[in-house]
Amino acid sequence: MNPMKNFDEFLREGIVKKQHIDMSRARFLVKESEKAYQFITSINKGMGINDDNANSIVKLSYDTIMELIRAEMLMHGYNAAGQGAHEAEVSYLKNIGFSENDIQFADQLRYFRNGMMYYGKILDKEYAEKVIEFLNRVYPRIKNMSK
């Protein structure tokens, strides 16, 4: 994995564009993330995490986090699109006060999710549990910013 670029670099490159604040779309993304978070929580409490559902849990957790980051960006008039958009969204975590460790974990999550989607990478229960721990820690924090 390459080192994470600064959010301003993504702006300069045109991957992130400044736009009008889009509260309607941001609220929609927050609501969708709430539903997904509740679903992940119910799976975790019900059937639990295992090697068979690890990829699904990781993908859904990633999407939940990214929906909140996108909502926060939209509330501040930013939108990322095209090649590098997901990296730009992860780099935005620094702008909203997340630690370098959290940003690195989110970037690793992005990288592994990409590996699953495009290269057939299989993740295990242990990694999925780490992702759930990360989700449970960052989800409330980002969600509170999006109010």
Residue ranges of each PLM-predicted region?
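Terminal alpha-helical segments
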Residues: 1-147
